[in-house]
């Protein structure tokens, strides 16, 4: 293998039989120049990607310490073992960049809170569990105090790297929309629905919203008889009113349209939550009297 480009003293671009690869090794680029030979004994890790990914990785290695790349690789290996599936190659670059960027913020005393953390934990529970492990690993391995909020961001990267899943932008958009809806529901019901008495109904609502968004994206809408929708409107007027406000939010802020059937289905889930809140308030009142 011959050196084509030196990124830093521990990372170089090599030509291996006409194929470009990124080679990592302690001191591999030190006191070397273009066309110098590199041997297997010099290499700790080697990365082969599609041309676009290779260029992005090269640009990244020009700017960051390669230990962030190694850490991201370890997290991905762990994720693939737990999930029993391969992640796409692009997640390595995105996760490396994120870990390095977060480290810079932390070292500068900047802590970015993840306002979508609760929704991410419910929507992507498998990925979130892996991300929690990753936060502990990063803190120990790099000596940088990554926060619990970081698990949410890492979970999104892992989710976007899974085969056949949404890309990172779409995953974040999905969580953001659901978070906005949850805030609207909390405002209407005047209750923190994340709290313990309502955790099950909260999880059910979040999962329903995820499926609703997926159906809307695929234009495969829920089937609900017109009679059932009308019954829901009569029987659960408050919840149906909230579902209509959600439709306005989706249309105005995200240019998403949902059908009357989806509206009725959503109202049923909101009513389940609203009823739980009412019952909890009654129980609390009874306890206060006693």
Where would I find each of the regions flagged by the language model?
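A cross-family "folded-core" feature that marks the main globular domain of proteins
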Residues: 1-290
């Amino acid at each position: 293998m011959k050196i084509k480009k030196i990124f830093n003293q521990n990372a170089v671009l090599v030509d291996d039989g006409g194929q470009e690869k990124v080679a990592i090794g302690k001191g591999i680029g030190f006191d070397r120049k273009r066309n110098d030979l590199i041997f297997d004994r010099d290499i700790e890790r080697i990365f082969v990607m599609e041309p676009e990914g290779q260029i992005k990785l090269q640009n990244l290695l020009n700017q960051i310490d390669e230990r962030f790349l190694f850490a991201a690789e370890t997290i991905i290996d762990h994720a693939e073992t737990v999930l029993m599936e391969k992640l796409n190659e692009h997640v390595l670059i995105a996760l490396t960049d994120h870990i390095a960027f977060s480290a810079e913020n932390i070292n500068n005393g900047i802590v970015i809170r993840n306002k979508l953390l609760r929704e991410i934990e419910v929507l992507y529970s498998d990925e979130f569990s892996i991300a929690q492990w990753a936060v502990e690993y990063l803190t120990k391995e790099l000596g940088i105090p990554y926060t619990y909020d970081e698990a949410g961001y890492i979970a999104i990267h892992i989710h976007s790297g899974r085969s056949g899943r949404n890309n990172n932008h779409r995953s974040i958009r999905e969580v953001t929309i659901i978070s906005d809806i949850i805030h609207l529901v909390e405002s209407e019901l005047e209750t923190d629905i994340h709290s313990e008495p309502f955790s099950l109904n909260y999880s059910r609502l979040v999962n329903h919203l995820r499926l609703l968004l997926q159906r809307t994206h695929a234009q495969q809408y829920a089937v609900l008889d017109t009679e059932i929708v009308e019954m829901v409107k009569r029987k659960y007027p408050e919840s149906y009113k909230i579902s209509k406000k959600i439709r306005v939010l989706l249309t105005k802020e995200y240019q998403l349209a949902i059908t009357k059937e989806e509206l009725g289905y959503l109202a049923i889930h909101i009513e389940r939550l609203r009823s739980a809140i009412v019952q909890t308030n009654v129980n609390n009142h009874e306890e206060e009297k006693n």
